[in-house]
Amino acid sequence: VSGDTSSLGTCIIGTVAGDLHDIGKNLVAMMIESAGFKVVDLGVDVPKEKFIEAVQQNDNVKIVACSGLLTTTMPAMKETVKALKESKLQGFKIMVGGAPVTPEFASEINADAYTPDAGSAAVKAKELASA
């Protein structure tokens, strides 16, 4: 077994296009990092193409986490998940979260997981990475 044994893998995280909120995303990034992941934070207002590029440009990506606080950016989250699924890139799971996001919405847009807060996001990320 080779590679970086100190890491559970890489987590790409960002707030979806059109959304400039970062406090929730930052908390999730900190929790996921402290759980043992390398975190690549793409920032806010991230277009779907940038999420895909980040998966292509980073090694051992296990999680892509999409955050959104505004109901108006939920379509962007849906498009991001769709683009990631259609990209044919493999080996990672997609997590979504943010105030307007529900388990039902996450399921509807084919995300692999929904978490309501930063603590549960870290737990779920570990579960998904080891699945």
Set out the residue ranges of the language-model regions:
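Long amphipathic N-terminal alpha/beta scaffold segment
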Residues: 1-25
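A charged, well-structured terminal subsegment
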Residues: 124-131
